[in-house]
Amino acid sequence: MQNTELLLKELTLEEKCALLSGAETFKTRGMPQHGIPQIWLSDGPHGLRKQAGESDHLGLNPSVPATCFPTASAVANSWDAALGEEIGAALGEEAAAQEVSVVLGPGLNMKRNPLCGRSFEYFSEDPYLAGKLAAGYIRGIQSKGVAACPKHFAVKSQETRRMASDSIVDERTLREIYLTGFEIAVKEGHPRSIMSSYNLVNGTYANENKHLLMEILRGEWGFDGAVITDWGGSNDHALGVKNGSTLEMPAPGGDSVRELLAAVESGKISESDIDARLSELLPLVFDTKAALDAAPREFDAAAHHALARRAAEESLVLLKNEGSLLPLAAGSKVAVIGDFAKNPRYQGAGSSMVNSTQVDVLLDKLIDSELNVIGYQQGFDRHGKPDAALQKSACELATQADTVILCMGLDEIAESEGLDRSNLRLAQNQVDLLQAVAAVNPKIVVVLYSGSVVETPWLDNCQALLYAALGGQAGAGAVADALTGKVNPCGKLAETWPLAYADVPSAADFATRRKTVEYREELYIGYRYFTTAEKAVRFPFGYGMSYTTFAYSDLVADEQGVSLTVTNTGSVAGTEIVQLYIAKKNSELFRPAKELKGFARVTLAPGEKQRITIMLDDKAFRFWNVKANRWEIEGGEYELLVGASVEDIRLCEKISVHGTATVHPYEDRDLDCYYKGDVLHVSDADFEKLLGHPIPKGKTKIDRNLTLGELNHARSPLGWLVWLVLTILLDVSYKRGKPDLNILFQYNMPLRALAKMTNGAISMGMVDGIVMELQGFWILGLVRVIYEAIKNVVLNAQMEKRLRGA
């Protein structure tokens, strides 16, 4: 094992600077002459994506086969941190077998808005639940000697303009909603690394944000690992290093090294800043490399497939079961309809896409079951194209069956990295099919596949609804067993399903092309809004049915937690997820009506009862006092609410809590809309009162951070042409029903990323020449690009020679 302190004395300043950026898309720099190995990083929120051949960061090229587990959005419905730890251990085992040192996951961004195209990679709208699950994944991954890298830190809630948007959020909301999940993950999971997000937070890029990285992450939480940029996400590398960012990825080349050298020479940063970052990176490199050298190069694919199936079973959510249609009796004549039954949708698109070791198919599993499958019909085109013939054939089959199993869902394009959803609706051809089938056979079980929320105005057309989410490669077997009763669904929703998208508090201005993203709704996201505003929803947070029933009784509560008795009052075994919320009526603060502060899973046989305890932690009663700039507790009477969902509260006890607050955070501000939870249309004036300063107005500037999608603002025909070509290509891909992820990435990419993602082929000086050209200095800009290109080639060659020790 190398001694980092001694190594820092051996390395030249140039070598030190070189180690703080990647060498290839998923590889760090190695320096064999100093005994420093190169290590692999790989995407892996729900399955490893190591690309042995040509690499990319969008999942476009094939990867080594790996187990595809249910996505985070699915596993969150299990409310099972121990299951997350098992999945994490399997991910770590596969990473070690493939010689990957860092698994880039889990993702635990808050689900501010259900249109976020990457929601399938995230756990929940609730920070407590997300943090607990993420901590489980992290512990599991790192139990195999591999480093976990939770992401994206922080306040990233959309894909639109993701590399250049500025999240404007008040400090209380930042702390209580958008950082608490990460805090739990860091303090309870102890990750060796963490990924910074692309976006700015209150005017400063997250990757160089001193408040986030140094004051909170490293200072308050005690994180001593490596902060890794999202791919191409570095804006000012030197400032990032100074303010706590460790490793710039993927491969910016020698230009990045020269940037740090110049910053040290100018006094912008010091060599001690460089050493501090290497003291975070080098132990990770040496420790993980030693663990991988000792790890087997194979893993038990069958065992991991079985784990993926169990994870899918625990993640299924039964949303409707009218007349106890489910489970279906053995021998029932069933018609299987829907393209997803034969061509499964089991994962999302983008950098998390896994090359699965195998994929189960629901139709095959149903045929192998005790059901009498009388036939299958595709029913609809999965990409939304109307087809009367497919619908007619499906209806004819439905007339011959006792029950119809209709598989509906979102297609691969509806949910993807790089692209936010345009609405919450299912394709109309699927809804039309459901209505047509219901007219000839009302006994319909809908199996729904999606990574996030969908609107369900069609719910009355089916008798049962089983939410399969994106259940991974073994999800089909789990669904088949749930339909036949071999598995009793026990999942509960980790996010609210609204009646309509317009009810979502951030609906009015989500994913616009504006440079700023204003978090006007404050604390009121998800159930925190709906319960406070008393707004009806389709399915509340924490909701999920079972084939059995449970009774709650004998609640005892104090400041430490609650204990109660749970009894299975039904006729089959089942698992209940008991949820603990707190409420404070007549609070002097504005606060959500209810907030999740604990939960427990309990599995019971018919008639069995069990005493369970749910403990409260240091986050139960705290709030961030923006005036005192610290965590405090509002004293007084609280209600401890125990229930089966946020709306189904079974037991309640009142307790008195000693307060620590000495000053009211809002005594000099009129914030009625926040006290009422009326945040659908917060005025500029009210939001500015909350922020304590004017709302920043993002202006389009022709500089390094101009995105390619904004080149229409350039003063250059070349810029206009590039913008026009990109726009046309993007529109064509949309019309084909298959948006091009690479073009989408480029469209939202700032010019500076050209120097961060081309392995040194383009320098920042060349980017500055391009900027000059776009500003209207056509000839000077072109000359600058040519000059900087020649200079870059020469300097890179000289530097690489020195770094090789030649």
Language-model-detected regions and their locations in the chain:
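Extended non-globular C-terminal regions
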Residues: 721-806
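A broadly tuned "polar low-complexity/structure-edge" signature
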Residues: 40, 71, 247, 357-360, ...
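A generic signature of intrinsically disordered, low-complexity regions enriched in glycine/proline
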Residues: 47, 368, 507, 572, ...
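Terminal connector regions
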Residues: 618-665
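Glycoside hydrolase catalytic-domain context in secreted enzymes
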Residues: 1-619, 623, 637-641, 646, ...
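Charged, amphipathic alpha-helical linkers/stalks
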Residues: 646, 653-723
